[in-house]
Regions:
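Interdomain regulatory linker/hinge segments that flank or connect interaction modules
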Residues: 1, 25-67, 197-199, 212
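Alpha-helix boundary recognition
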Residues: 12, 37-41, 123, 206
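A short, compositionally biased
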Residues: 17, 39-44, 124-130
Length: 220
């Protein structure tokens, strides 16, 4: 829904931004998240959707080498809302009246849809108290929350992919094939895998790409 959360310095230097949606790697259309890791080795350019427009990002020749040097693993990270899982007793917000499942919608009247945006917004309120707008059981309530000097609320967030999907943050793609169609789909998958395999070999054996440094693999 909201693209990917980008904080890896190599990706940022290459021109990626949080919110980008990956549309294609080279000439290969990307429809599923798992395909990014499949095609990123050998990638020369990536097409993203940003603010409703398509943008082509040309990758540096040693892109994979840079990622390996940085120890990059989680490159394109999912974005999700801020849902409360629990509040530890040691937190200054332990008595704020939060409950598991509370969806924090914003701070001080400002709507904030994604958790990564909360992280940056809280930096403006170090050591202060903020009013949080919270959705609980289809009702909106307000709670005062304390931000510590490290710009944190000390609240454990809930990570629930199923719930995020139900809320419309993620799309799950399921393809059903008939018996006959499965052969065609299998052949296309085989051909795509073979082409991608040789593309990866070409990148790995080209010293300029430094792809050999990332033989351990990357997680998109």
């Amino acid at each position: 829904k909201g693209g990917y959360f980008i904080e890896d310095p190599v990706l940022l230097d290459a021109g990626f931004k949080t919110g980008d949606k990956i549309l294609a790697i080279n000439d290969q259309s990307i429809k599923m998240d798992t395909e990014i890791g499949q095609y990123i080795i050998g990638a020369e350019q990536m097409t993203v959707q940003r603010d409703g427009e398509q943008k082509v990002i040309t990758l540096p020749e040693n892109f994979l080498g840079q990622l390996s040097d940085e120890g990059s693993k989680n490159l394109f990270r999912y974005r999700y809302p801020f849902i409360v899982e629990s509040v530890p007793d040691s937190s200054a917000n332990a008595s704020a009246g939060l409950k598991e499942g509370d969806l924090i919608l914003g701070l001080n009247g400002k709507k904030i849809e994604y958790f990564d945006l909360f992280q940056s917004e809280l930096k403006n309120y170090k050591g202060k108290t903020v009013q949080a707008e919270i959705l609980r059981e289809n009702k909106t309530i307000i709670r005062d929350l304390k931000v510590n000097n490290e710009a944190k609320l000390n609240i454990y967030r809930l990570i629930d992919a199923k719930r995020f999907t139900e809320m419309g943050y993620y799309d799950v793609i399921k393809t059903d094939y008939s018996f006959g169609e499965s052969f065609g789909a299998g052949a296309r998958k085989f051909n795509s895998t073979v082409v991608n395999y040789f593309s990866q070999l070409k990148a790995i054996f080209n010293p300029k790409t430094e792809a050999y440094k990332g033989l351990g693999g990357f997680k998109a």
